[in-house]
Amino acid sequence: MTEKRYLKWYNKVGYGSGDIAGNVVYAFLSSFVMIYLTNTVGLNPGIVGTLIAFSKLLDGVTDIFFGSLIDKTHSKMGKARPWMLYGYIGCAITLVAIFAIPTNLGQFAQYAWFLIAYTLLNAVFYTANNIAYSALTALVTKNSAEQVEMGSWRFMFAFATSLLIQSITLGAVTALGGGAAGWRTVAIIYAIIGLLVNTLSVFSVKELPEGELVDTTDKKEIEQDEKYNLVQAAKLLVGNKYYMMICITYILQQIYGAMISMGTYYATYILGNQNLFGVFSWAVNIPLILALVFTPTLVAKWSGMYKLNVMSYTLATVARALVAVAGYMGSGNVTLMLLFTAIAALGQGPWQGDMNAVIAACSEYTWLTKHKRVDGTMYSCTSLGVKLGGGLGTAITGWLLAASHFDSALAVQPESCISMLKIMYLVIPFALDAIITFILSRMKVEEANEKLRAAV
């Protein structure tokens, strides 16, 4: 029997465009906040890393809190869309604030400014926006194929935006005056673009009636499914082993991204050409986009996501090992590094495309085992993973830079820093890919759901 389809092509494209807005924040922040703070504002990378780590203490609580709020929201716009719409206004304001730290402030005040703006962006506004955006995958369609297609469109836009931002930002900062003024102007432009695209994405889809989502029109039954407090919500999540696997995988992916963002330092101080960072960004993002184009077809051909995810990430792990080998052979092997970087990205693509559908399957697993609808809360793993993983990754890079005696005033860094940059950019990404591959090999949620449905 063919599954009912709920979406037109323009609904999927409109939804996917929402990650343009998301990556105007995330890609810009993760790729450039450290080099902006160290080389323009003049802050210590170790202290910045510690402040980011401190900020992350709030994130786990706010993720579950906002996820639970979304599950309990009833409005004309639905459960998630209001949070996605209004949350981004705060994202835009705080993004500009982070890249507009006054250079004439005392250093203590600069650290405080950064901590407050960064915490508000991540723990409050980005959390509300991103969880709501991710939860829409399960709220606008019940068709698993459409959920994979939504994820593919979403991440095609995400990686295209990330590629564009990584390629043009440094040049744009210079063209707009350079220094603090250049960074501030670029941040304002990105924030305005994000605000417009996010609004378009919100109104491109419509949530299904709550009764249709739970296959009942009984209002009391729907309300009963939503009766749980914050502690119970946390227990539901922790009790779902597949949620924990996805959450850990998401965190590791974001730490991976933070290490790859060290390409700005690697290109500048090891390869001797900061513009090569943009070239490596192309080698990462173009293969990812190509993989996403074919992900829905491959999922359908292989009758599920499990086998595709494990095989493709195994390829990515092998390729990242070869990137490391090429990198340690010397700077003359940039061509080999680019080739293997592209192959690794191609292997990472399918998981990016079907990840939201896997999360929807995790939510169904909780419904089948606990009889609770926790779609919004379940998608907290996306926001938690992005913020905790990205923040922790950025913090680690700051600590490692400080420990290796990085000095932004030096054109040539000490050998200790050069060695550390190689470890961060070459070795750690390979190790993270290997761990993710192992976790994905245990991610058999589709099989578990089939057994549970058969037992009913």
Give the positions of each predicted feature.
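Membrane-embedded alpha-helical bundles of multi-pass transporters/translocases
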Residues: 2-456
